[in-house]
Amino acid sequence: MVDVNRFKSMQITLASPSKVRSWSYGEVKKPETINYRTLKPEREGLFDEVIFGPTKDWECACGKYKRIRYKGIVCDRCGVEVTRAKVRRERMGHIELKAPVSHIWYFKGIPSRMGLTLDMSPRALEEVIYFAAYVVIDPKDTPLEPKSLLTEREYREKLQEYGHGSFVAKMGAEAIQDLLKRVDLAAEIAELKEELKSASGQKRIKAVRRLDVLDAFNKSGNKPEWMVLNILPVIPPDLRPMVQLDGGRFAASDLNDLYRRVINRNNRLARLLELNAPGIIVQNEKRMLQEAVDALIDNGRRGRPITGPGSRPLKSLSHMLKGKQGRFRQNLLGKRVDFSGRSVIAVGPTLKMYQCGVPREMAIELFKPFVMREIVAKEYAGNVKAAKRMVERGDERIWDILEEVIKEHPVLLNRAPTLHRLGIQAFEPVLIDGKALRLHPLVCEAYNADFDGDQMAIHVPLSEEAQAEARLLMLAAEHILNPKDGKPVVTPSQDMVLGNYYLTMEDAGREGEGMIFKDKDEAVMAYRNGYAHLHSRVGIAVDSMPNKPWKDSQRHKIMVTTVGKILFNDIMPEDLPYLQEPNNANLTEGTPDKYFLEPGQNIQEVIDGLDINVPFKKKNLGNIIAETFKRFRTTETSAFLDRLKDLGYYHSTLAGLTVGIADIPVIDNKAEIIDAAHHRVEEINKAFRRGLMTDDDRYVAVTTTWREAKEALEKRLIETQDPKNPIVMMMDSGARGNISNFSQLAGMRGLMAAPNGRIMELPILSNFREGLSVLEMFFSTHGARKGMTDTALKTADSGYLTRRLVDVAQDVIIREDDCGTDRGLLIRAITDGKEVTETLEVRLQGRYTRKSVKHPETGEVLIGADQLITEDMARKIVDAGVEEVTIRSVFTCATRHGVCRHCYGINLATGDAVEVGEAVGTIAAQSIGEPGTQLTMRTFHTGGVASNTDITQGLPRIQEIFEARNPKGEAVITEVKGNVVEIEEDASTRTKKVYVQGKTGMGEYVVPFTARMKVEVGDEVNRGAALTEGSIQPKRLLEVRDTLSVETYLLAEVQKVYRSQGVEIGDKHVEVMVRQMLRKVRVMDPGDTDLLPGTLMDISDFTDANKDIVISGGIPATSRPVLMGITKASLETNSFLSAASFQETTRVLTDAAIRGKKDHLLGLKENVIIGKIIPAGTGMARYRNIEPQAMNEIEVIDHTEVSAEAE
């Protein structure tokens, strides 16, 4: 066997007849499979042991030779070689075809490769191959045209006219084979290149296509006649097995049926040829043989598929590769693994962040070999067999051994669907009773898990390296930040938030207000004994917390705080300021001075002069975690998170918050608000009846009225709510629910959507406290159902989007430290109209500068060129008033097959500079795909007059951008740089004309009458600027402007969609994806290079081809950039393995075989398919074979000294 980790590339070509014979171990002559009485394979049949190898290890068919000692001997009685039975998965046979047969992939594929090679139409080919017409192969001296078709009748007439032997015409695949042998590749190519110089239109397109195929044959060394088969390979029998079922019947792979048909027809043809049967019978048999081989290779590609019992189409060789159940996606990219299990998950509130609870029964099964090894080592059992029995019996001693084995041995937990890399994390197992896996509550957010019956899978990493990677790279405590935006992903939720919210509340006049304590213990004692309340404002000596970063003016004073906040600050890391107010200033700059008593001040007076602070909410806790991570990194943060979780749970239990119907308030003026709305609607309808407004206007006015009524109720609800109301506390803290839920309970439900997505005019006036009427209940069911179906559709759509994104970017890996490019990207804040969707500060964080950034007023250099911009530096740059900065960007990176560290910036998941080997493409794809489910599915119909265009938003818009489709509601763009001089309206054609005066001439643009203008007369516009509202078509923009403009536009558009839904995604992820869409160019004029016009190729390959020509003084080729949608980009990748496993498997493989393509295994997918370690992370060549070295020589202490001390 080839060592899979040793070879560099993999090539696929057409198989020549001699190649097929060299693979084969013998000819299959009979259609029989196995003898139904003896159940032994038949000689010369499809399962013959002589050809394919023995069915039992080290045993020949007749039984003369048994055992391994006869290895390699061929039995003299039955002719079977004594070897392993697994050779039946590797050894191939062959069938000698009695007539040539065309390969359906090359004749039927689009475009037809045979047709292009011979310059014949696919229809003509079909007539010849299936014996409906003759084709002239050699006209000799007759006036017949070569390759012209003749019907049976015409053929006979011509024979009579010119005489026998005066010309050669044949039918069937044999004729095509003869024609293919006559093709002179070099001459044809030269002729076509000459023709291209003058051709245009359809003629040119056809010539380019033909040239492409002929050139592929010429360069790859494949011969065109190999597209016709004279010998058919038979795949190994264990890949098309036959299994006996319980009832004595057999279940066989469909391939066996298909092979049997081929063999039967081939044998019948051989017999007919021997008997010199009439030509028409032979022709018919040849046609049937051709159809049988077609069905074997790709059943159903031509005509009706061959069906098995119950009219089910049989699965051919092509079907074995295609689709989700095909070889690529079912067996090569996703395999089932051993040492795994799955169970329901339950919450484990007492676990540490890096632990998970594993049921004992599960653990003993998963770690069985490890336990057995220890049992033998401890001599509880003599051998492995006895140890296994001991484990299966459930001997008492195994549990102690199991405890030892799992110590320090991490396990992986995975929850499907794994939308991003945090869907698999490592934990240290803790043995528990019961049958459910226990999960730490804080990792739920990363997994998107809840405890309503979710299941999770558990895997055991076996090798030392796998364990080390699990512990160092995948441990849950390491994954504090979300790779998509660099924000903490482990923020506390629900009970934890509520507990900390309640704990940090302040209240005036509670028991114990104004007491002063010397330290925390005293405060807790007073609280426990009922002298002070958690919410009472009290004093505490600052000196009792000496490690906090106090200002000098604050030391040795008394600080006003609450008992709850003393407890809350006790769990904080010591170097963090004492948190008194829930804001960033307190967190970063320290506790405000107003809380400290000056000597001789009365504490009560100070307390009375202070406002009551709001408690710490979910968002504040997130900020605290982010700050902690920034300062102390993972270890301290995960320990702090555990303390925060415990404190939150403890106090939410203690607070005893409950919800009853009495907690839902009644709004006093609800009736008035609703009456006023009714009155307004009546007026609107009256105006409509009088013809003062259109139906569209009326609809908009009515829905607006009800929306305003609901908002008025909401506003009233917020004004009158009691901050101690449990529902308000849950809502305000961010633990559960929002104002919309609250207003449905206490205000009114409002307007509902009808099944067609249009909003119904009749609102639901009741709320859930009052209860809905039957009609209202019925109205509200529409929305509920739509919600359910939308979610289901959205999940599938979002998953497919993620799959396409991963496919297009899976080979983008950080390959080097610095690519040394001199290009950069000029960035400013992303705006949508007047609204800022993404600030400059956020865009700058974690990127490298391309040029130095200067203060706009003083001119001082804020940061030099090629420096990393930290959060603080980004804030400093923006505060200085800088509006645009040139940064290093993935767009402008010059690294081949990936990105360099400087162009990428920091790794958002760690907050440090990205490492070489990081699979940033996959991370980018997951970061964009994972929030896909949170985006809406709707295409908004903006009602009525406002505009007549539908604005696509949410997930459909993201798909539109990444697939580079023509957008809905397309904007008109200008091709001229200049000024808008006139906008004239033409009522007769219902259009407007916009005139733009440029330096070279005037641009005239016709826009629909109803389109909303983005420009006014006198505005200055650049090329590619939108004149009307709507989305710009990126392909059009690429024609008018340059690649970078398109990249910047696409980046901004993606960010607008996500940010408008409140989802934050790092720019760099979008940059990685967009760069992949623009990595190809189309050759326009080949110049002196040997490139073909119209060829699609990588920018880097194109540059290389030109470089050589320029050096030798020739004319370089010209090209234009091409924008491809992600599906197309995935299929155009350099790796045929990756493309074939994505979509259109047969087309990709057909093309790759003709070109003799080489896959250099640069991406992740290709390596997974062939079972090689992926070239990312620790699998990169530079990280393999690293020997650990001590940093400095370790001093060895003399043993005698140690022993002397010990005495």
UniProtKB/Swiss-Prot annotation:
Zn(2+) 1 binds at residues 60, 62, 75, 78. CDD domains: RNAP_beta'_C, RNAP_beta'_N. Binds 1 Mg(2+) ion per subunit. Its cofactor is Mg(2+); Zn(2+). The keyword Cell inner membrane does not apply. Keywords: DNA-directed RNA polymerase, Magnesium, Metal-binding, Nucleotidyltransferase, Transcription, Transferase, Zinc. InterPro entries: DNA-dir_RpoC_beta_prime (IPR045867), DNA-dir_RpoC_beta_prime_bact (IPR012754), RNA_pol_asu (IPR000722), RNA_pol_N (IPR006592), RNA_pol_Rpb1_1 (IPR007080), RNA_pol_Rpb1_3 (IPR007066), RNA_pol_Rpb1_3_sf (IPR042102), RNA_pol_Rpb1_4 (IPR007083). This is DNA-directed RNA polymerase subunit beta'. It comes from Streptococcus pyogenes serotype M3 (strain SSI-1). The lineage of its organism: Bacteria, Bacillati, Bacillota, Bacilli, Lactobacillales.
